[in-house]
Regions:
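Buried hydrophobic positions in well-ordered alpha/beta secondary-structure cores of metabolic enzymes
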Residues: 6, 27, 55-57, 71, ...
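Active-site/ligand-binding loops adjacent to catalytic centers
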Residues: 18-38, 89-185
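Short amphipathic alpha-helical segments
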Residues: 4, 82-85, 116
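A glycine-rich helix N-cap at a beta->alpha junction
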Residues: 3-22, 26
Length: 185
Protein backbone atom coordinates (compact mmCIF):
# COMPACT_ATOMS: atom_id res chain seq x y z
CA UNK A 1 0.00 0.00 0.00
CA UNK A 2 2.71 2.52 0.96
CA UNK A 3 4.76 1.54 -2.09
CA UNK A 4 2.17 2.43 -4.72
CA UNK A 5 3.39 6.01 -5.19
CA UNK A 6 7.15 5.29 -5.52
CA UNK A 7 6.57 2.24 -7.71
CA UNK A 8 4.04 4.12 -9.81
CA UNK A 9 6.52 6.92 -10.46
CA UNK A 10 9.27 4.53 -11.58
CA UNK A 11 11.46 4.67 -8.45
CA UNK A 12 13.84 1.85 -7.63
CA UNK A 13 12.53 0.29 -4.43
CA UNK A 14 14.64 -1.87 -2.14
CA UNK A 15 12.96 -4.07 0.44
CA UNK A 16 14.68 -4.19 3.82
CA UNK A 17 13.65 -6.96 6.21
CA UNK A 18 12.35 -5.82 9.58
CA UNK A 19 10.45 -2.78 10.76
CA UNK A 20 10.85 0.94 10.10
CA UNK A 21 13.62 1.33 12.68
CA UNK A 22 15.70 -1.34 10.88
CA UNK A 23 15.20 0.43 7.56
CA UNK A 24 16.14 3.77 9.15
CA UNK A 25 19.55 2.39 10.15
CA UNK A 26 20.21 1.34 6.54
CA UNK A 27 19.06 4.69 5.13
CA UNK A 28 21.16 6.68 7.63
CA UNK A 29 24.21 4.62 6.65
CA UNK A 30 23.55 5.25 2.96
CA UNK A 31 23.13 8.99 3.55
CA UNK A 32 26.41 9.15 5.48
CA UNK A 33 28.43 7.28 2.85
CA UNK A 34 26.76 8.07 -0.48
CA UNK A 35 25.07 10.96 -2.24
CA UNK A 36 21.68 10.12 -0.83
CA UNK A 37 19.42 12.73 0.75
CA UNK A 38 17.18 11.77 3.64
CA UNK A 39 13.68 13.07 3.03
CA UNK A 40 12.11 11.88 6.25
CA UNK A 41 11.41 13.87 9.40
CA UNK A 42 15.13 14.13 10.15
CA UNK A 43 15.37 16.55 7.20
CA UNK A 44 14.83 20.15 8.37
CA UNK A 45 13.54 21.25 4.96
CA UNK A 46 10.72 18.74 5.18
CA UNK A 47 9.79 19.97 8.66
CA UNK A 48 9.64 23.56 7.38
CA UNK A 49 7.13 22.49 4.74
CA UNK A 50 5.08 20.53 7.25
CA UNK A 51 4.77 23.64 9.42
CA UNK A 52 1.97 24.56 7.02
CA UNK A 53 -0.25 22.20 9.06
CA UNK A 54 -0.07 24.70 11.93
CA UNK A 55 -0.70 27.66 9.62
CA UNK A 56 -3.75 25.97 8.10
CA UNK A 57 -5.21 25.15 11.52
CA UNK A 58 -4.69 28.73 12.72
CA UNK A 59 -6.25 30.12 9.56
CA UNK A 60 -9.21 27.73 9.89
CA UNK A 61 -9.92 29.20 13.33
CA UNK A 62 -9.42 32.78 12.09
CA UNK A 63 -6.09 33.01 13.96
CA UNK A 64 -7.81 32.56 17.34
CA UNK A 65 -6.48 29.41 19.01
CA UNK A 66 -7.56 30.28 22.55
CA UNK A 67 -9.13 27.22 24.16
CA UNK A 68 -8.35 25.00 21.17
CA UNK A 69 -6.86 21.51 21.46
CA UNK A 70 -4.91 19.78 18.68
CA UNK A 71 -4.19 16.06 18.43
CA UNK A 72 -1.34 14.98 16.14
CA UNK A 73 -0.34 11.37 15.43
CA UNK A 74 3.25 10.52 16.35
CA UNK A 75 5.40 7.98 14.54
CA UNK A 76 8.79 9.41 13.66
CA UNK A 77 7.60 12.68 15.27
CA UNK A 78 8.02 14.89 12.20
CA UNK A 79 4.41 16.10 12.16
CA UNK A 80 4.29 17.03 15.84
CA UNK A 81 7.61 18.87 15.70
CA UNK A 82 6.49 20.74 12.59
CA UNK A 83 3.20 21.75 14.22
CA UNK A 84 4.96 22.93 17.39
CA UNK A 85 7.54 24.85 15.39
CA UNK A 86 4.89 26.52 13.25
CA UNK A 87 2.76 27.48 16.25
CA UNK A 88 5.78 28.92 18.07
CA UNK A 89 6.75 30.98 15.02
CA UNK A 90 3.24 32.40 14.68
CA UNK A 91 3.20 33.27 18.39
CA UNK A 92 6.62 34.92 18.20
CA UNK A 93 5.50 36.98 15.19
CA UNK A 94 2.26 38.03 16.87
CA UNK A 95 0.07 36.23 14.32
CA UNK A 96 -1.58 34.26 17.13
CA UNK A 97 -1.78 35.32 20.74
CA UNK A 98 -2.54 31.94 22.33
CA UNK A 99 -1.01 28.52 21.86
CA UNK A 100 -3.47 25.63 21.71
CA UNK A 101 -3.13 22.62 23.97
CA UNK A 102 -1.21 20.09 21.92
CA UNK A 103 -1.33 16.32 22.26
CA UNK A 104 0.69 13.70 20.45
CA UNK A 105 -1.12 10.42 19.85
CA UNK A 106 0.64 7.05 19.83
CA UNK A 107 -0.57 3.50 19.41
CA UNK A 108 -0.05 1.22 22.38
CA UNK A 109 1.97 -0.90 19.93
CA UNK A 110 4.60 1.80 19.31
CA UNK A 111 4.66 4.33 22.14
CA UNK A 112 8.15 5.54 23.16
CA UNK A 113 7.18 9.23 23.21
CA UNK A 114 4.08 8.50 25.32
CA UNK A 115 6.17 6.43 27.74
CA UNK A 116 8.64 9.31 28.13
CA UNK A 117 6.05 12.03 28.73
CA UNK A 118 3.78 9.87 30.92
CA UNK A 119 6.34 10.10 33.72
CA UNK A 120 7.04 13.07 36.01
CA UNK A 121 9.84 15.29 34.64
CA UNK A 122 12.40 14.14 37.21
CA UNK A 123 11.83 10.49 36.28
CA UNK A 124 11.90 10.80 32.49
CA UNK A 125 14.36 8.61 30.65
CA UNK A 126 13.99 7.98 26.93
CA UNK A 127 14.07 4.35 25.84
CA UNK A 128 13.25 3.02 22.37
CA UNK A 129 10.61 0.28 22.29
CA UNK A 130 10.13 -2.86 20.25
CA UNK A 131 7.08 -2.27 18.08
CA UNK A 132 4.22 -4.66 17.54
CA UNK A 133 2.11 -4.75 14.38
CA UNK A 134 -0.39 -1.91 14.26
CA UNK A 135 -3.20 -0.69 12.05
CA UNK A 136 -1.33 2.64 12.23
CA UNK A 137 1.38 1.25 9.95
CA UNK A 138 3.13 4.56 9.32
CA UNK A 139 3.47 5.09 13.08
CA UNK A 140 5.06 1.71 13.87
CA UNK A 141 8.30 3.35 14.98
CA UNK A 142 10.00 2.37 18.21
CA UNK A 143 12.86 4.87 18.06
CA UNK A 144 11.74 8.13 16.40
CA UNK A 145 14.69 9.98 14.86
CA UNK A 146 13.00 13.28 15.72
CA UNK A 147 12.83 12.60 19.45
CA UNK A 148 15.65 15.07 20.34
CA UNK A 149 13.76 17.74 18.38
CA UNK A 150 10.55 16.81 20.23
CA UNK A 151 12.22 17.38 23.61
CA UNK A 152 13.66 20.75 22.58
CA UNK A 153 10.40 21.97 21.07
CA UNK A 154 8.28 20.79 24.00
CA UNK A 155 10.55 22.76 26.34
CA UNK A 156 10.17 25.85 24.13
CA UNK A 157 6.41 25.30 23.75
CA UNK A 158 5.86 25.03 27.48
CA UNK A 159 8.17 28.01 28.16
CA UNK A 160 5.97 30.06 25.80
CA UNK A 161 2.87 29.12 27.80
CA UNK A 162 1.69 26.15 25.76
CA UNK A 163 0.56 22.83 27.18
CA UNK A 164 1.87 19.57 25.71
CA UNK A 165 0.99 15.96 26.39
CA UNK A 166 0.93 12.57 24.72
CA UNK A 167 -1.92 10.07 24.79
CA UNK A 168 -1.71 6.37 24.12
CA UNK A 169 -4.55 4.77 22.17
CA UNK A 170 -5.66 1.20 21.57
CA UNK A 171 -5.77 -0.44 18.18
CA UNK A 172 -9.57 -0.49 18.43
CA UNK A 173 -9.64 3.28 19.06
CA UNK A 174 -7.50 3.82 15.94
CA UNK A 175 -9.86 1.71 13.83
CA UNK A 176 -12.95 3.45 15.24
CA UNK A 177 -11.44 6.90 14.61
CA UNK A 178 -10.46 5.91 11.06
CA UNK A 179 -14.03 4.86 10.29
CA UNK A 180 -15.37 8.09 11.80
CA UNK A 181 -12.93 10.22 9.79
CA UNK A 182 -13.71 8.35 6.58
CA UNK A 183 -17.43 8.91 7.10
CA UNK A 184 -17.25 12.57 8.05
CA UNK A 185 -14.02 13.88 6.49
Amino acid sequence: QQLSQPLGSGATVLEVPGVFDDCMKVVEHLAEHYRVALLNSKNSWRILGQESYAYEVAQWFNWDLEGKVLFVPVGNAGNITAVMSGLLKMRRLGIISDLPRLFGVQSEHADPVWRYYSKPKAERVYNPVTVRPSVAQAAMIGNPVSFPRVKALVDAYEAAGGEFGVVQVTEQAIMDATILANRHG
